[in-house]
Amino acid sequence: MGQKIHPLGFRLGVTQNHHSTWFAPLNNYSELLKEDERIRNCIQQYVRKYVRSSSRSAEIARVQIQKKTDLVEVQIHTASPSLLVQTRVPNRSTNTQEIGIEYLRRNIQNTLNPGNRKLNMTLSQVAKPYGEAIILAEYIALQLESRVAFRKTMKQAIKLANKSGNARGIKIQIAGRLNGAEIARVEWAREGRVPLHTLRAQIDYCHYPAQTIYGVLGIKVWVFQNKSLISNNQQM
């Protein structure tokens, strides 16, 4: 019986790096780990409530956190930084609207553990968004939630990945009650090469749920990216 391992965790230290970088004594490690989770949850809640809609995804590729003694650095990699900056959030206390990024910064600052630590939050633009697995998975989820046929959605996602120029191969898998069928099944599509057993291959992976009227669909996306340590002519 085959055993499966997470493609990103399998490549840590080879082609993947941790998204959180900090050191802590053993008695304080759990508190800093919970703080990381609160920061990421704060960003996700802000995106779901104010940015993401039925026709627009947040397009956040990843969130990197670095901690020092008196400084917490949060870097948000997104396809459209202007979308996060231009979002307006209603302020109930003053009955006005404030800039969304300032609202997010204040909420993250409030989630930090007590101490005189400053927060430095930056937005970084992703040059080729549709070469990122998470952004492709969000796109597929939006299409499925809008009742677009799953085969058409997979073909369109593969086209977007190929147009980005950052994908040497892509595999998409969707599981659940597809097109409202009574019996759940798994369908997948692949184009190019996706060498999951090769550690030097730069594989990006994401699992994302889609909330449809027929239930939850599970979406998995694997992208074999161009920035791999393997040359195009090397055989595997």
UniProtKB/Swiss-Prot annotation:
Lineage: Eukaryota, Viridiplantae, Streptophyta, Zygnematophyceae, Zygnematophycidae
MF terms (GO), sorted A to Z: rRNA binding; structural constituent of ribosome
Entries under Gene3D superfamilies matching the protein: 3.30.300.20, Ribosomal protein S3, C-terminal domain
Superkingdom of origin: Eukaryota
Keywords: Chloroplast, Plastid, Ribonucleoprotein, Ribosomal protein, RNA-binding, rRNA-binding
Localization of this protein: Plastid, Chloroplast
Name by which UniProt lists this protein: Small ribosomal subunit protein uS3c
BP-aspect Gene Ontology terms: translation
Gene name of the encoded protein: rps3
Domain KH type-2 intervals: 47-127
Quaternary data: Part of the 30S ribosomal subunit.
PANTHER family: 30S/40S RIBOSOMAL PROTEIN S3, SMALL RIBOSOMAL SUBUNIT PROTEIN US3C
